[in-house]
A protein has these predicted regions:
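Conserved MFS/SLC helix-loop-helix module at the cytosolic interface between two early adjacent transmembrane helices
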Residues: 63-101, 310
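Intracellular juxtamembrane helix-capping segments at the cytosolic ends
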Residues: 117-131, 354-367
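Helix-loop-helix hairpin linking two adjacent transmembrane segments in secondary transporters
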Residues: 145-195
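Interfacial helix-cap and linker-helix signal at transmembrane-aqueous boundaries
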Residues: 39-40, 71-72, 155-165, 278-279, ...
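Extracytoplasmic
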Residues: 12-38, 43-47, 64, 154, ...
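C-terminal transmembrane helical hairpin of 12-TM major facilitator-type secondary transporters
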Residues: 293-299, 305, 310-362
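Paired small-residue
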Residues: 91, 102-110, 339-347
Length: 437
């Protein structure tokens, strides 16, 4: 007798992760650049001075990353993410009440600390726990919402700021972010399916037809679980050894992951300067803000396919192709024609999924099970530290040269380095067979 398959709670987790990434990474982080020019013009700050808060944001985020996987594993995920959402939204709204640089710097530190528990780490970890199948696809779907919400947010703020001012814009942004995330964290999110007495999506139990097959299947399952437990134990011991004795630092994959994350994350910082690039090219603020929307459209559109392509062709090939496409977008941003800049912004949007979608899947090639969270946190932490100065440097390049040409070239060079590192990683994977694709 066949039973109708029940709806799996993993899809609720996916919906929660979509809102989590959309309301944090999308609505706040991806829209930060819309405020740069209005704030600098109103308060007389230099671009490099204001954008230094983004460097402090990145440093604070990196400092918190080692604790994310540890806390999610040991504490109630609802409390961790809920408290982080209140801190994240509150620090964003506080910027609307600020008039001195130090206030942005203080808010940036708080915002960065909270972002580690919201923006990039929790969703891949939770989805990896809940989905045994289609992991790449669902990570990509969740990441799509950061682009979707960023696209809506940047477009909306492009009209809100001229109408009611940048101060009200910050307050609205912060309240919306916290208001969307907190209910999701409290009522929907759970760390792993075992917490609810469930199996992960795709982890199906065998259903033999007779007692003999039941016994035989039980033996096979026991043997399989023993082997998997042994592999998992070895992986966890390896990961523990890396934390205590520096074994992680001896793995080439760690350095490759750090370089890919750091360079792609730094290249993604250029997104914050796209509205200013549009103003430099003679576009009105509402039109220039659309450049961020176009970049986030490219970001969102590419995420629909990147995760699925990874499931089909492997993350190495997809990561290499995506980095070349992102590099082409950088080249188009160097031209002054508005239509070319808009096209370049859209293609440039592929830069952001390099770190938010593809790097988490890249890390799953090398670290499995409970070892994945700590390893991914370490890779993200060191990569974020590498990327952190580029927010300030990108703004300072404009202060020094009066043009965003140098900023775009440096960002493009970083993406080229991502491509070269991925090629090296591909050779490493071919030489050393790994569990998984």
């Amino acid at each position: 007798m066949e039973t109708k398959q029940k709806f799996h709670y993993a899809w609720i987790i996916l919906a929660g992760c979509c809102i989590l990434q959309g309301a944090s990474l999308g609505l706040v982080n991806n829209c930060a650049g819309v405020f740069f020019s209005p704030v600098c013009e109103d308060l007389g700050f230099e671009m490099g001075q204001l954008t230094f808060y983004r460097t402090l944001y990145a440093l604070s985020s990196a400092a918190a990353m080692p604790f994310v996987a540890w806390l999610l594993l040991r504490a109630d995920v609802r409390a961790v993410i809920g408290i982080a959402a209140l801190l994240f939204g509150g620090s964003t709204a506080f910027m609307g009440l600020s008039s001195e640089l130090w206030q942005w710097y203080a808010a940036g530190i708080l915002q960065g600390f909270a972002s580690s528990f919201l923006c990039t780490l929790p969703a891949p970890i939770l989805l990896g726990n809940w989905f045994q199948e289609k992991t790449g696809t669902v990570v990509g779907i969740a990441a799509v919402f950061s682009g979707f919400m960023g696209m809506l947010g940047s477009t909306g703020l492009g009209f809100v700021i001229p109408a009611v001012g940048w101060r009200a814009g910050y307050v609205i942004q912060g309240l919306l972010s916290a208001g969307l995330i907190v209910p999701v964290a409290v009522f929907l999110l759970r760390y792993r399916p075992e917490d609810m007495g469930l199996l992960a999506y795709g982890a199906k139990e065998a259903k033999p037809k007779n007692a003999e097959s039941w016994a035989e299947t039980g033996k096979k399952e026991k043997t399989k679980k023993t082997e998997e437990s042994g592999r998992k134990s070895e992986t966890i011991q390896s990961m523990n050894g890396s934390q205590k004795g520096g074994r992680l630092l001896s793995q080439p994959a760690f350095y490759m992951g750090v370089l890919i994350y750091g360079c792609s994350c730094a290249g993604a910082y250029l997104n914050s300067f796209l509205p200013s690039r549009g103003i430099e090219a003679g576009m009105a603020l509402s039109a220039a803000a659309m450049l961020t929307s176009l970049a986030l459209f490219g970001n969102m559109f590419s995420k629909f396919f990147l995760g699925r392509l990874c499931d089909s062709f492997g993350v190495i090939l997809v990561l290499a192709g995506a980095s070349l496409a992102a590099l082409a977008g950088h080249v188009l941003l160097l031209f002054d024609a508005p239509a070319v800049i808009m096209t370049g912004a859209c293609i440039y949007g592929i830069t952001m999924p390099l770190s938010t979608v593809l790097l988490p899947l890249f890390c799953r090639l090398f670290w499995k099970g409970d070892a994945y969270g700590p390893a991914f946190s370490c890779v993200s932490m060191v990569g974020t530290l590498i990327a952190s100065p580029f927010n300030t440097w990108f703004g300072s390049f404009y202060d020094w040269t009066g043009s965003y040409g140098l900023t775009i070239c440096v960002s493009g060079g970083l993406i080229l380095f991502v491509f070269l590192t991925v090629c090296a990683a591909g050779r490493l994977v071919r030489r050393s067979p790994l569990p998984g694709k």
